[in-house]
Amino acid sequence: MKEIHINILAVCLISVVLLSACSVTKHLPEGEVLYTGSKTVILNKSTTPVGETALTEIDAALDKTPSTKMFGGILPIPFKMWMYNDFVKYKKGFGKWMFNRFAANPPVFISTVNPEVRVKVTTNLLRDYGYFNGKVAYETVVDKKDSLKAGIIYTVDMKNPYFIDTVYYQRFTPQTLRIMERGRRMSYISPGEQFNVVDLDEERSRISTLLRNLGYFYFRPDYMTYQADTTLVPGGHISLRLIPVPGLPAAAQRPYYVGDASVYLFGKNGEAPNDSMMYKNLNIHYYNKLQVRPNMLYRWLNYQQFVRNAQMRASNRTRLYSQYRQEQIQEKLSQLGIFSYMDIQYAPKDTTAVCDTLDITMQATFAKPLDAELELNVVTKSNDQTGPGASFGVTRNNVFGGGESWNVKLKGSYEWQTGGGEKSSLMNSWEMGISTSLTFPRVVFPRWGKREFDFPATTTFRLYIDQLNRARYYKLLSFGGNATYDFQPTRTSRHSITPFKLTFNVLQHQSKEFMEIAADNPALYVSLDNQFIPAMEYTYTYDNASVRRVKNPIWWQSTVTSAGNVTATIYRAFGKPYNEEGKKLLGAPFSQFMKFNTEFRHLWNMDKNNKIASRVALGALFAYGNATIAPYSEQFYVGGANSIRAFTVRSIGPGGYHPKDSKYSYLDQTGTFRFEANVEYRFRIFKSIWG
């Protein structure tokens, strides 16, 4: 059999060699030369960050895959040219299908590569990145064995780049100049930096955004242009002047204020409004019945509701038009999920030359009130447990007319032992549960709830009940609920506060086998026994990945959980000692512990193809007072999808655990202290595929 495989391989290799020897130029049009590829020679290569970006752009401008390569140039086999030569003569039938399938694109000729145009484009790229003295040339190299085939050699001499010496803002109105000068510290172009048009365009966009956030509604980046002078400071330096374009419209040179607002709410099937009402300065037009509370519409559209500073709310400045606020309004309304279509327009209140007020017009179509979701999955675990699962959820949107959503979700799963042990064919584990949650798109809390955050904020109330059956071991009933406030005061910081979190676990049934295991491991039994866990939790997250110009982002999250302390304090007020164990609530002892968990991640982008990701995590769990052992569900483990992904749960580190034939292998092994760190080298394999 081995000899047969070797012979087949030899035949294939010989066939490839013979096919490669076949001429690929026998059907070329008269006067055309087949393009075989290109090579780029870089002289005086720049090593600056801007230079590396320029080289990437240059490679893209000069690159052209020849017809003499297979699969986009991965293999040096003229497959497409064979197809073209053999099937170009067919007009129908199988031959035409083969041509259309494998050789429909015409061969690449030197004339279609247009090396002259590519040289001009590359020269302009050098100018764009500050290489004003750079030169680009090309040479056509004819194949010595076949004069109808030729390649191209490009020579790029980058020479020395130019750097920015000074940047001036000139010829704008005094008020505009004051705003521009105040924002100069955030400029994308500064003295000493290498000249490049990308930063120049970003600077125009930055200034335009700055002005539009201060009322300049009609201002645009195209209303500014640069003047550059390379003679003032010799030695490769440029003096820049940013000036307004000739004929700058008068409307773009003054701030505007926000006036009245009108809202047109269409029915879910597009029915036009047939009724209206006034709420303060908000004119609401709606179809049949108003499905949104007027005060919520006013809150979302009124600028003063977005300002959390009392002095700013009292000043007239809050009425200034702001591009940032406009984007926030559109984002908030979109996140509600109650509209299938939405459009917001700003227009002058009148046509007079002195008009400085913009009225808002909003048009929106209501979405269908119900959403349904079905999920199916199959799970295979390392302890030979396998089985399917499913969940079905229904969400009712805009329950109280303020963007609230009510969700009900059912879930179920079962597993069976797939190993060859006793009773392995029986379905021996199952789980079912139901949960419901009510989510408000704002902070529902006295005083805090009167103001809006610039970024998403939600309040969630949740109740659930789950039944878990581990055949031959135990049956566990869990139910509870929580109230959680999530808000984001800045772009990089997020807070999650859970002032009330209740978990009640009832161990309904214990088998003889489970009791034997528990006798050998009392801590296991205590962690699974009836438990009442009243807890509070706070989580802070810092993430600067969305911040512009952050090259190496960091992510940090810390969580503090306190359980049973408020309950123990109440018992203490009624005469029960604080450190007395065994105190019960609703017939079950309540847990008392403190838990701290923190995790830090850093991503170092070495270049566009290589990254190093590092991660450090630390956690500690202390049980005291009414309980000496922390609940099983709150303990730590290392490995798995949410930890170090390359290892299964509890299979790495000094606490590694490998339950090969243990009768306890169905239980995850956990601990009360956690420390883990790992470093990953990530490299680009192909386009968006990383290793």
PLM regions and their residue ranges:
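Bacterial N-terminal signal peptides that target proteins for export
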Residues: 1-9
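Interaction-mediating elements
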Residues: 2-3, 23-335, 341-347, 357
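C-terminal motif of bacterial Sec signal peptides marking the signal peptidase cleavage site
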Residues: 18-21
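Amphipathic hydrophobic-ligand
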Residues: 131-136, 217-221, 386-390, 432-434, ...
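Short small-residue beta-strand/loop micro-motif enriched in glycine and branched aliphatics
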Residues: 164-165, 306-309, 370-374, 417-419, ...
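C-terminal outer-membrane beta-barrel translocator/porin domains of Gram-negative envelope proteins
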Residues: 279-287, 379-383, 496-686
